[in-house]
Amino acid sequence: MASTVSTCQDASPYQPRNYQLEMLEASMKENIIVAMDTGSGKTHIAVLRIKAELDICSPDKVVWFLAPTVALCIQQHEVIASNLPAVRTRTLTGLDKVELWTDQSIWDAVLNGYRVIVSTHAVLADALSHGFVKMSQLALLIFDEAHHCTRRHAANKIMQDFYHPTLTKSGPAAVPRIMGLTASPVVRSNHQELLMVESNLDAVCRTPRLHRQELLKFTHRPHLQQIWYTPTDPAGFRSASLTLGALYHAWENLDIGDDPYIQRLRKSPLDDRALKKALLTGKTYCREQLRRFVDRSRHIFEELGEWAAEYYIYASIKQLRDRVRDSYMSGDWDEAEKAYLVDFLSKIPTSDIHFALNDPDGFRISPKFESLLNFLDSSDQREFSGLIFVKQRVTVSAMTSLLSVHPYTRERFRCAAYVGWSNSSASKDILGDLLNMQLQRDTLDDFRSGRKNLIIATDVLEEGIDLSACSVVVCYDKPPNLKSFIQRRGRARRKQSTFAIMFPTDDTSADVSRWQDLEQAMIEAYQDDERQLQSVSALESLDEEVMERLTGDSTSAVLTADMAMAHLHHFCAVLPPQPYVDMRPVFSFETNEDGLLKGTVILPSCVHPKVRRTEGRRWWRTERAAMKETAFQAYKSLYEFGLVNDHLLPLTKKPELKTHDLGSMPSILETSEQYDPWIEWAYSWSSPDIHQSRIVVKMNEGRGDELCMRLIGPEYLPPLSPMTLFWNSSTTFTVTFKAAERVPLVPLSSVEDMRAITALYLKATSSRVCSAERDFMALFAPDLHHTELKGWLDTYEGSDPAMEVYSRGHNPLLMGVVRDHSRYGEPFLFRKWLVSHQNPSCSIVELECAPFPHRRNFLRRQTLANSQVDVDEAIPDSAAKNPIVAAEACTIDRLPFTMAIFGLFISAIVEQLEIELIATRLRDTILRDVSFKSTDHIITAISTPLAHRLTNYQRYEFLGDSILKFSVSCQLFFQHPNWHEGYLSEGRDMIVQNPRLAKAALDTGLDAYIVTKRLASRKWSAPLISEKLGRVPAKRQMSTKVLADVVEALIGAAYVDGGHSTAQACIRRFLPEINLHAVDTRTAARSVAPESARHMMNDRLKDHIGYTFEDESLLVEALTHPSCDYDSTTQSYQRLEYLGDAVLDMVIVSAIFNHRIQRPQGDMTKIKHAVVNANLLAFLCMEFAISEEKLDVAQTSKDSFAVTSSQESVELWRFMRYRGQGLKAARDASLARHRALRDEIASSLLQAPHYPWHALSRLNADKFFSDIIESVLGAIFVDSGGNLAPCEVFVEQIGLMAYLRRILDHGIDVRHPRSVVQQLAKTNIQFVLQRVPTEEGGASYQCSVQMEQAELFVVTGCLTAEEAEVTAAVEAIKFLTRDEGSTPLNKS
């Protein structure tokens, strides 16, 4: 049946090589036949060619890959599909019964949507013959084993009957391009066949001409060995084998008249002619079956010996009897013929076959097989992998059985048989074919994996089939022609391998050199450089002087051609390292008509395309000189492009990336004292410009009366934000401030009244002895005209004896603060009078009071709800809890407590005014160009946690950090299109590092505005003019981190205040070199980039991304892995991934920060790290797919077929452009883990209350999966002109935003298991990681958990250190919560 896209887990190791790229370039220019040794990578050249063709051809055209056998079709399809996962591919072979597809609609359905078809030659030839497929549908035809394209072969039929006539009639545009692949360009010994193959395929034969030495380096020619044996006497079987002799005797004496077919013909007079013919020829079905069976038995005897022949006869007779009993297996056989064959063979005496003999002499073998055993015994058994070619299928099965049971081989070799996939249903043999086709399905995979180490096969394994490199290949019979010799020898391509041919001692044509000489003669017809090898070696010994010199513009640094190679290799060595990528420069050469050479060098794909490829300027006689000159020109280009400094060294970790010299900045710095705004006010009071703001105090959101006051200052009063003051659990006060207004012509006496009133309020709520100084900085007064203040003061200043107040019958609701002078004037709140009459003439008056609140910081909610008394006297309380004081010892303030309570709020108001003055000053000076709308965000940004204010900078710093990283990343990306990702990353790190930001804070004077003083509410005293005048500023210690944090917090505050534009202005204030507004984001990124190559892309998948690219080359770049070296016009995705990383941070952090539930900075950081975790992004990348309809053909009856429909997923990762089997193997391994863990991870993301740390650590996806997400984000950002909105759409499309919302809305626990363990443990817990080497050369990881120097347990066998640590942490959580019944973190 047809195979569709699949993976080949054990594809042969492969690394990109120069000669493969050379062959690719040649195939793009003309039709060629790639002639290279077996194992040198021809199929991978074809894969590159297919990829290139699909990028440029019309999407309705097909690439058709042709192979001579079904097995080879299946193998090549696996290679193509696994290396081009984005391409829909399929096979069409006889296994699909294509010969029965007689309807055009069937063919249309089969080909619909597929871009690559792999089939045998006959399938395409027949389809073309019947018009089901037209030559115009084909973009590229690839002929594997192209030497078959001769004479009447179906390959030649395709060319002669369809290609050439179409070419003649309509021209080259009407026919597909041609590529042939072969390791043996001639089949027989006639070298003229090379020209015939070229003509038939309309192609020229090419072998790598410029890198022959590299080709030989990777192609290991085996040691050729002859194995001699004494041939068996053909007539000796009669006496040597009783069973075979009896079989032969019975066959010789077989009476044709007893044949059921003859007897049937004799009974019918109409069949007289057929009867005569049968009697004359002696051919009937039964006689032919027996004849072939006897011949095969004799052949096995001669090849393998008596035991094998008797085994074959015994097994064949048993198989026949089993088939006769099985009506399904016997099919259409004639019952009489079945009975006749069974009866004939039943008379043959058969020996008992013993499979478990320990005596080698019990296995009577032929001299030829004995020679084979001796050879195998002498072979190196370490990592043995062998292949034995035999002539006949029956020999395959018999030899496999014999090797599997013989004492010399059964313990040493794991044998398997292989005869290919020819349609066995077409064979009419019911006797003697012992091979079970189903048992060989896994043979090749078992051999590649090492489960089998010796295959016995027919010539079906000569051509194309991808096998692991063999250490031993044996031809049990001489190769029939040159093609077989070359192909079989090519199987032995392991280093120090052996290719053996068995010869009888009486063979006169056993000279192995005959094949070698003939092969060399054929190859020379198309390989000129082989004949010139000696002269080239002589030329390379010449010493050519390369006179080139480069001097740094501002230094005395010099580069000569002799130094250029070392410098260029060093430049490549310090590029950002990438797995699966060879970072070395690649040199190639071209030759002119004079035989001179010119070099070309290609640098790794992370280097900008403009300087990635450099050609030499002169022609040279030697490769060595050409390389020197080319390396010099390349390094000169790097210098001129700005990637090398004036010292002629790479920029990485050099001063060129530093914007400021920070030296070694200490972690603790001496900085300015906190700015004190009262000093300016102190001087302003000498000639005040009185401003006042009306204050309104409401209790419980306005329920009840208002208290109105005024705040007075000597100069402009900044707007103050409303304040909420928490009296107790049920009572709050809201303090609002009206806009300040100037009050002209306030006499000095009125100012003094204000000072007295301010002192009165401060004293009314204090038990301390107040200072006589009244030169307060901020003044407070009731909401009256200044002319009325004197009268108000006369009314409420002072106190009266309690007895006097009692006697006046004063309104309890207007009672002032009670002061018990027996307790040194301790204040109380009046509750009620208590009067006791001991006698008629004497009454004792007492006061039941409530304790005066000790709390002074009303800005924070109180922690104990019952710790305060209520203000409202109507609230009942138990008298037993209230102190009773004697009226005679008390006085009561004239100022009612309902007014005096304002004195408790003055400290908070003054502190709020102070911080507002600091923020206003900062806004109007350092931040004057930032255009903050409000100082509220500035206040938050400059308040350190140490100040213990209601808000601090931590949340804004979290936001500002990402905004700064985003802005700097954008600026460097757009400003330096010549910089690779390494320079960009280091340049960004230089700018956003704490020392650089701390220096910016010091340079601008920001350090003075950072609030670190803590409000001491209990010891607070109102600031006085006399204290501030003449005060000398001091210094304070501050950490570098705090300085940097405040800069980032101000950036975050600016973003909250006015969006990105305000944030960019703030960044520019502290980092003048960052000016993103000055960068044209729409044109800067592509300003020096050449046009990228085309790249096939699924249109529906592009729609699924949620963004339509104006410049699709950006999407191509976003999908180009650094290993993709075949496209020198497109840079790898590393730059876009660098930018996308910052874009993703910006999108995620904004969503976290702006969520309705405000979280502390620590929680936001944990959420961010969980959401942008590389394994989560990789999982979403693997999941990001569309579903497409896939049509296929199913057989509904014997001759009927129907089109079936199914759905298949097309994932984004399939479109990543790469090269290299290492990356492919890693990709497939990650996808296998994804398939195993998908349900668990997906379920966790949708339902679990915890983040799936454990499952994601086991996923251990390669980084390129998450890189693709970030690089596509970067591409969208660039193409949209720096617009974050379409980036947010893509993040939504991949499912990341949905999971982030779930985390934020439902409080998903994102703590890392290790953090959970540390929180659960009452003592320090240590995780000790260890790398454990494995026998296969790899490594696993283990992690032990230790508590108080005792080891709790060890987790072993983990793929990575992260998995080991997370698994250990999960187990530790179980251990620590084993008695609680549930764990705080599931293993999800």
Swiss-Prot record:
RNase III domain boundaries: 906-1059, 1098-1281
Helicase C-terminal domain sequence ranges: 368-537
GO molecular function list: ATP binding; helicase activity; metal ion binding; ribonuclease III activity; RNA binding
Renumbered ranges of motif DEAH box: 144-147
An example Gene Ontology CC term for this record: nucleus
Chain positions recorded as ATP binding sites: M36, D37, T38, G39, S40, G41, K42, T43
Binding site for Mg(2+): E1137, D1267, E1270
Enzyme class: hydrolase
UniProt similarity note: Belongs to the helicase family. Dicer subfamily.
Protein name: Dicer-like protein 2
Organism of this sequence: Aspergillus fumigatus (strain ATCC MYA-4609 / CBS 101355 / FGSC A1100 / Af293)
Organism taxonomic ancestry: Eukaryota, Fungi, Dikarya, Ascomycota, Pezizomycotina
